[in-house]
Amino acid sequence: MKKLILFALLLSSFLGWSQDPIAYNYFDQALKKAATGNLKGSIDDYTKAIKIDPLFAEAYLNRALSKQKIGDIKGALTDVNTTISIDPKRGDAYTTRADINYKSKNYKGTIEDCTQSIVLNPKDYIAYNLRGLSYIHIEDKKNACADFSKAIQYGSQSAVKNKKMFCK
């Protein structure tokens, strides 16, 4: 999950960034609170940023990540869906939704979202690895092992372990 959060923060596009300095200040405060583990405080500040700028896709996505960490899966899914509706070219949003779907055992949804993420970012090793795990759950070993290999090619250490475990 930490890698997913870092991925979302590092690979975020500028399209979803707010042009409003007050919204951005709340967003910045929320990031700091999330980094120190104050997830409820971060959610409050992301919400304030969103109220000022309802099209602030990055705030929705980060709020989704914080909600997911506190177990508000429904709220996280709503926020990530909003992110995608605002900015459908955000691969990291599809990867985040795929992670939520995976943890909810919606493997078909995970595969679809990972595939979309890979279309938008062909080197998204998190999406390849997560899609590979989903293929394992639906007993499609061939595609799982191919995805683990791709994830390894792009730098995933988790995929190395998964390939050793599932692709014998």
Regions found by a protein language model. Name each.
Residues 2-168:
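Alpha-helical tetratricopeptide repeat
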